[in-house]
Amino acid sequence: MTKEAVIEVRGLCNRFGAQSVHENLDLDLYRGEVLGVVGGSGTGKSVLLRSIVGLRTPNEGSVNVFGQTLLELDEHQRSLIERRFGVLYQRGALFSSLTVTENIALPLIEHAKLSRASAERLARVKLALVGLPCLTGDKYPSELSGGMVKRAALARALALEPDILFLDEPTAGLDPIGAADFDQLILTLRDALGLSVFLVTHDLDTLYTICDRIAVLSQKRVLVADTLEKVAATDDQWIQHYFHGPRGRAAKQAADNAPRRA
């Protein structure tokens, strides 16, 4: 069966002055998959994410989403596409002056044009969806633990019921138990909501636990994008060190010993 690509990146080039980060980069995200994007420092993982979601205009190349080329759409058409994105930034990016409920309600008021009361009722539903108690909604971001901030930001990313969820280092700063719980939450939401997930990470446990495919950024392009087993077998120095070094071996052993998902 042919896989449906919900995102198609072709010939992407990103430059900052004389420095080139991406050259002729190609990558697909298939419907329903969790795609992990990895690479060494400076390979432009977050730049790629920003280029796809419309926060950065690439110097060259195209980004097609649901069969439409973003750069060719007018502002209204592009807005309709981007409403189908949910984005979780590395540090949550919650507004410090708003309560958690107000943070989640904001896109519902701004984009879905709900009343404040309706938006805040729906925000409480989103809180429950990510495993946070209702009382969390009355708190400010500064009153939350790191794990709670991640979940609150995830609830906001899910506010408009997106088709594609973008995650930028979602387990960064979490302890191992919190990171494992967050990984399982992503899988549960993917299956329950029919999400496609674009996941930038350096967390080997996440790669082994929840990713269907892995894309490795290297040499200014996607060096390989395939299943973990095939990626780990690629004859490349960085890949071999990353997947077969001490941390990689530990992550593989933990995954091998974990109960299999149904």
Describe every region a protein language model picked out.
Residues 69, 117-135:
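Conserved ABC ATPase "signature" region
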Residues 161:
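Conserved catalytic motifs of ABC-family nucleotide-binding domains
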Residues 140-144, 148:
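Conserved ABC ATPase signature
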Residues 165-168:
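Catalytic Walker B motif of ABC-type/P-loop ATPase nucleotide-binding domains
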Residues 53:
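Helix-to-loop junction immediately C-terminal to a conserved catalytic motif
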